[in-house]
Amino acid sequence: MAYRISRQSVENMPTFADQYRDTPLPEQLIQHYLHHQGKAGRWENFMAFSDAVELSDRNTCYHADALARTGDEAAAMHAARELWLVPFSQPKECDPVFKLWRDKGNLDAETAWERYVISIEANEITLANYLVRFLANEYRPHASNLKLVHTRPTYVSRIDRYTQDHPRVRQLILHGITRLARTKPDQAFDVLQQYEQHHDFDPIALEAT
């Protein structure tokens, strides 16, 4: 079946899929067809059917690549950013469009930091460790401290370690407080009060803690 799908032309695909319209197969057939076209770099064929189904994760990656390869670079770069800025690893099919996106200078320092933060918050430590390579040098100490208070929340109680009133420092403090509050709520409250004397926390972020 897979071989037969891969051999179908764009013109024949609707008829081929219609043969199985009373089964779950049409969507599966189209997904497989799209993946085969993307893997083969047949981008026009891919785009001809990309709106026919809700794309699988792998085909969503190919769709972003297809946009770039068929002339819609702005849409491709937007799609690549949306795919990259998640707290989990994407399929390898995303690698080419991610490389293109980075090569075009779209991975700035704040975007790299944002993905690192959401990965830590999702407890995806292995991914966070991988993402360190994309962080600007000035962000790396903050990344280490964020991971530290995530994995060992009591460290946020060491007030003298985090005296700088800087946005990323405030961010890691509040994350550490949130983690500490799960097991030691009274201590977390006391520590937060001490930090509030010297740090200008965003009221919305503070309320969410």
Regions found by a protein language model. Give the residues of each.
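Alpha-helical solenoid repeat scaffolds
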Residues: M1-T209
